[in-house]
C-alpha cells in the first residue's frame, strides 16, 4: 500500500514542493506512485513508438 512508501527518503523527494497540501491526500498520491508497470503497458508502449516516428 501507499503507507509503506512513507519513509524519510520518499517524503524528502515527494515533499510539499511536488505534493502540496490540498492537491492530493498524501496516502492517495502514494497509491499512484508505486513504480509498477500498468496492466496495459504494451498498448501504451506501442502508442509511444508510433508517436516517436
From Swiss-Prot:
Highest rank taxon of the organism: Eukaryota
Residues given in the record as chlorophyll b 2 binding sites: 53
Membrane-related topology note: Multi-pass membrane protein
UniProt GO MF annotations: chlorophyll binding; metal ion binding
Signal peptide: none
Sorted UniProt keywords: Chlorophyll, Chloroplast, Chromophore, Magnesium, Membrane, Metal-binding, Phosphoprotein, Photosynthesis, Photosystem I, Photosystem II, Plastid, Thylakoid, Transmembrane
UniProt binding sites for chlorophyll a 1: 48
Chief location of this protein within or outside the cell: plastid
Keyword Lipoprotein included in the entry's annotation: no
UniProt remark on cofactor binding: Binds at least 14 chlorophylls (8 Chl-a and 6 Chl-b) and carotenoids such as lutein and neoxanthin.
GO biological process, alphabetically ordered: photosynthesis
Residues engaged in binding chlorophyll b 1: 18
A single Gene Ontology CC term: chloroplast thylakoid membrane
Annotated compartments: Plastid, Chloroplast thylakoid membrane
Amino acids binding chlorophyll a 2: 51
Subunit structure: The LHC complex consists of chlorophyll a-b binding proteins.
Function: The light-harvesting complex (LHC) functions as a light receptor, it captures and delivers excitation energy to photosystems with which it is closely associated.
Family affiliation: Belongs to the light-harvesting chlorophyll a/b-binding (LHC) protein family.
Swiss-Prot/TrEMBL domain comment: The N-terminus of the protein extends into the stroma where it is involved with adhesion of granal membranes and post-translational modifications; both are believed to mediate the distribution of excitation energy between photosystems I and II.
Protein name as catalogued: Chlorophyll a-b binding protein 1, chloroplastic
